[in-house]
């Protein structure tokens, strides 16, 4: 993205939203630093809020030398999550991890709430079995639907139960 595109995108986001996004970005990058690596999840109240968060988190990560990849799952959720699952090393990733490994990539997964019901959660089962041990990636799961995200991460019968910490700002929770 060029500086001009980024400036144009910033100009369209209301200032209070930018301030929230910038504060969030600072917190999430500190939270996701390689020594901790706890996956996180965030529910955004709007497309504008989501884009502001993505922009702010990307800037903060790049400033710390963390590569970032944004993947929009919404066009084909199952296929795209399966493709991500194939990239994961599972146990091998943990065994091969050493101080000389490259900086892990921050994966920002947009539209993760697509898996938030019984009819769409099948791809989350193989994903969890490999994702929980992966050390190549840092994780930020984004969604728009609070109930679906809670179903995914807070329901004890789901494969992603407690797999990512909730970091949605209080004023964005509904």
Language-model features, listed with the residues they occupy:
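A short, basic N-terminal segment
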Residues: 1-37
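Conserved catalytic network of the ASCE P-loop NTPase/AAA+ motor domain
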Residues: 32-35, 63-65, 94-102, 129-136, ...
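Conserved P-loop NTPase "ATPase switch" module shared by AAA+ and STAND
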Residues: 74, 95-120
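Walker A/P-loop nucleotide-binding motif
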Residues: 34-55
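Short glycine-rich substrate-engagement loop in P-loop NTPases that contacts/grips substrate
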Residues: 73-96
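Sensor-1/coupling segment of RecA-like P-loop NTPase cores
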Residues: 114-119, 127-156
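Conserved catalytic segments around the Walker B and adjacent sensor/switch elements
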Residues: 38-41, 59-77
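Conserved small helical "lid"/interfacial subdomain of P-loop NTPases
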Residues: 167-174
């Amino acid at each position: 993205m060029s500086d001009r595109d980024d400036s144009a995108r910033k100009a369209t986001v209301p200032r209070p939203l930018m301030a929230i996004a910038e504060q969030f970005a600072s917190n999430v990058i500190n939270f996701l630093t390689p020594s901790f690596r706890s996956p996180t999840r965030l529910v955004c109240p709007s497309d504008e809020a989501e884009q502001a968060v993505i922009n702010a988190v990307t800037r903060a990560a790049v400033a710390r030398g963390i590569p970032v990849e944004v993947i929009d799952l919404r066009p084909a959720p199952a296929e795209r999550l399966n493709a991500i699952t194939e990239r994961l090393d599972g146990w091998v990733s943990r065994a091969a991890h050493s101080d000389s490994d490259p900086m892990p990539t921050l994966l920002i997964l947009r539209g993760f709430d697509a898996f938030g019901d019984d009819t769409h959660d099948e791809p989350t089962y193989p994903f969890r079995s490999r994702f929980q041990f992966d050390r190549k990636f840092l994780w930020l799961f984004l969604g728009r639907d609070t109930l679906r995200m809670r179903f995914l991460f807070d329901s004890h019968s789901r494969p992603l139960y407690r797999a990512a910490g909730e970091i949605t700002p209080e004023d964005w929770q509904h």
